[in-house]
């Protein structure tokens, strides 16, 4: 991903729950299994049953795009329905001001018992000024806020790069484990600059009730890896904090917080890093470099978090970079360089290792023309039975070439110089590049590419339809849209999408027919619901009857009007 090209850029604290709440907890964790009722190939099809950090309270949003599969669906929304989401009854309730841009997706915990303010539903918001807020999600009042900056520090400057500007503090969506520490913990990656001009990347672990640092944090991000690639010395590649940014959302799997790193406008030298930290000690437990003997291969993914399956394998798309087309006996790049690839990364024994990969057959041409996969995010699909009755374990991703790539998680496809040996490729399905990721709901995949209409692709017998079943009438400018889904089980499904414009626009569509727009924030008279300017990678958070939308100076809160 180069300057304007390779970037992902364009030119005792939880109450005791009764039986009903336990059922809701199971639903919110994604454990629907065969209860959804819709079938494919004669077999009931599940919504994703993905591991969630800790014990997930009902109506919680703990991680980017709702779960580790990155499905983007909240299936416990009982307040907002296609019948009441309309300009006459739904709109902007208030705006929460922040001290910087809000690029990270807001997260949400219900019924949090705080030591000083009683019990609240709390919205967690992080700004590019390096501030993390614990806010009353229903009123917007500040319960606590902390700065991730140490004494004498300020947020990082933009590193002569217009991607995140004018300052860089917290870009990546944090992750919450409500069972970690005495009251629950939110993990935050933040960048800063000290008085001597040195740059710092740190992992913070904050108490969800007070914002206090936990586990001896923050932890300075430092790493090295064997290799002779860009920026190496003496056979070792070293992580230089000023060269990198944590844009991808954090991922929590089996007690390890994973970070994945990108560059600033492709200012070299840089390579592709994934680094894991013990969630209870912040000790670094594993490091992987995906281009250790080459260069580039950064992990942008438009702010999307790496996905994970139920076995803890991580799936991500990395950007333009060196790929070794001379393969070893396993069919892997001989020097371990996986630029511009769809990667499956094992976390067995809490150690990171590339377990499988898919590389486009024309990777050299795609790399040279900046048509890499790394601009978009990966999504782990639930299991589907194919036409023979065989269970298929699939993941999906798309990048700048407008194709949708569906991979078999048991055999991604590797590299063949003559053709793409993958499970399914839907060519030309999208009318623009993807700087976002899809959402999944009820056997349907929703994609919003650049300057394209959001499209719904049905999944039947473990195959993705080659043409959309419905699409929005409105096209979304750069960077397109990462949709979110709210539903009550399989009913009352709404697709939400934020349009990056000035002002930003929140859209709501009937998820069963995207031609039906239920609402947008430009419809009400007298600019009643108008937002401020949008950010590139806004992802609406929809939970407990409200929709939270980040902007350049705060969070817009939408809900039913009184």
Annotate each language-model stretch with its function.
Residues 455-486:
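A beta-strand-loop signature enriched in Asp, Gly, Thr, and Trp
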Residues 1-14:
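N-terminal secretory signal peptides that target proteins for export/translocation
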Residues 29-56:
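Bacterial Sec-dependent N-terminal signal peptides
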Residues 418-430, 468-472:
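Inter-blade linker and blade-boundary elements of WD-repeat/beta-propeller domains
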Residues 57-346, 352-384, 392-414, 435-457, ...:
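Mobile, glycine-rich extracellular loop/lid and propeptide segments
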Residues 413-423, 465, 558:
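Substrate-binding/specificity loop regions of serine endopeptidase catalytic domains
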Residues 20-32:
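Bacterial N-terminal signal peptides
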């Amino acid at each position: 991903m180069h300057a304007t090209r390779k970037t992902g850029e364009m030119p005792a604290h939880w109450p005791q729950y009764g039986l009903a709440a336990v059922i809701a907890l199971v639903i919110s964790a994604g454990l629907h299994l065969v209860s959804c009722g819709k079938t494919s190939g004669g077999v009931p099809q599940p919504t994703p049953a993905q591991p969630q950090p800790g014990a997930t309270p009902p109506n919680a949003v703990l991680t980017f795009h709702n779960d580790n599969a990155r499905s983007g669906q909240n299936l416990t929304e009982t307040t907002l329905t296609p019948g009441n989401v309309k300009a006459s009854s739904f709109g902007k309730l208030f705006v929460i001001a922040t001290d910087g841009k809000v690029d990270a997706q807001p997260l949400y915990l219900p019924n949090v018992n705080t030591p000083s303010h009683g019990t609240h539903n709390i919205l967690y918001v992080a700004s590019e000024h390096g501030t993390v807020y614990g806010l009353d999600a229903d009123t917007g009042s500040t319960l606590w806020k902390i700065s991730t900056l140490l004494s004498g520090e300020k947020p990082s400057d933009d590193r002569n790069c217009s991607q995140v500007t004018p300052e860089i503090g917290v870009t990546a969506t944090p992750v919450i484990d409500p069972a970690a520490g005495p009251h629950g913990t939110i993990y935050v990656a933040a960048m800063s600059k000290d008085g001597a001009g040195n740059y710092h990347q740190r992992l913070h672990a904050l108490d969800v009730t007070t914002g206090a640092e936990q586990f001896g944090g923050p932890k300075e991000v430092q790493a090295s890896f064997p290799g002779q690639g860009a920026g190496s010395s003496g056979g070792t590649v070293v992580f230089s904090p000023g060269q990198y940014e944590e844009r991808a959302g954090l991922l929590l799997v089996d007690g390890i917080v994973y970070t994945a790193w990108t560059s600033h406008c492709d200012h070299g030298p840089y390579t592709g890093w994934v680094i894991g930290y013990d969630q209870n000690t912040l000790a670094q437990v594993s490091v992987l470099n995906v281009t250790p003997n080459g260069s580039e291969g950064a992990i942008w993914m438009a702010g999307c978090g790496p996905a994970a399956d139920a076995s803890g394998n991580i799936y991500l798309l990395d950007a333009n970079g060196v790929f070794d087309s001379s393969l070893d006996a396993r069919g892997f790049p001989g020097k371990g360089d996986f630029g511009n690839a769809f990667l499956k990364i094992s976390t067995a024994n809490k150690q990171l290792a590339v377990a499988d990969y898919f590389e486009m057959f024309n990777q050299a041409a795609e790399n040279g023309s900046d048509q890499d996969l790394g601009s978009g995010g990966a999504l782990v699909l639930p299991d589907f039975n194919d036409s023979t009755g065989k269970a298929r374990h699939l993941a999906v991703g798309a990048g700048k070439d407008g194709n949708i790539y569906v991979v078999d998680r048991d055999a991604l496809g590797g590299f063949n110089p003559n053709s793409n040996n993958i499970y399914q490729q839907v060519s030309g399905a999208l009318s623009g590049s993807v700087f976002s990721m899809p959402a999944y709901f009820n056997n349907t995949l929703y994609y919003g590419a650049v300057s394209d209409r959001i499209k719904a692709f049905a999944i039947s017998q473990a195959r993705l339809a080659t043409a959309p079943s419905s699409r929005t009438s409105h096209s979304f400018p750069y960077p397109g849209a990462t949709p979110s889904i709210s539903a009550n089980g399989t009913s009352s499904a709404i697709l939400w999408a934020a349009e990056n414009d000035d002002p930003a626009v929140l859209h709501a569509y009937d998820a069963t027919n995207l031609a039906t727009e239920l609402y947008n924030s430009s419809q009400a008279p007298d600019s009643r619901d108008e937002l401020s300017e949008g950010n590139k990678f806004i992802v609406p958070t929809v939970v407990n009857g409200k929709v939270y939308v980040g902007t350049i100076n705060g969070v817009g809160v939408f809900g039913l009007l009184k």
